[in-house]
Amino acid sequence: MSRISFGKDNVQDTKGKIKMKKNYQLILDSEISNLNGRRAKLLLHSCCAPCSTYVLEYLSRFFDITVFYYNPNIYPKDEFFMRVNEQKRLIETMFPDSSVGFIDGKYDDDRFYEAVKGLEKLGEGSQRWYECVELRFKETAKRAAEGGFEYFTTTLSISPHKNSQVLNELGADIAEKYGIKYLFSDFKKKNGYKRSCELSAQFRIYRQNYCGCVFSKNEREIK
């Protein structure tokens, strides 16, 4: 299990050195430009329908997208299926021509609890969160490699509460191991989060009030 210290705007490596934050929006712009109009296959890990609204609106202009909904951290089980159904409904509403695909990831909460064992009391943005993201990224990268996708990425960076540097560095490391590319991104840029709220309201998407796991739910209720 890797141990990395990270805050909202920076990351410390295992030697305690602060890594300079990169502008991942500029990196994404450059990657899209280098495609020269070619529509590469992208497997998009979606954490939830609301966060995917803007990301789908944005990236569907440049990529052939399949959404992969794999979030075994969601609690309780009924909540998981509610979020899955909202994701499906959003895709069907935004893309009635079926131009965006969908893969329904298995609800396997045992894998999540095993991944965060011993870290249950740590809060959002902690090592517990890192292990949760790593679990989901590994499964996404595996599916992407098996499915012949050129890239994978996630909707997670759209949240103002998620550290884009941690997400991108982790994604790149995992992608390399599976022989594919990670699409660097920071979807909160260009008013992405604001746009996601507008689109969620437009499509009447259910917006949950906690990240997903039982620990984040309890932390939210305490606040």
Where are these regions (language model features)?
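Nucleotide-activated chemistry modules centered on ATP-dependent adenylation/adenylyltransferase
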Residues: R3-F6, K15-Y54, L59-K223
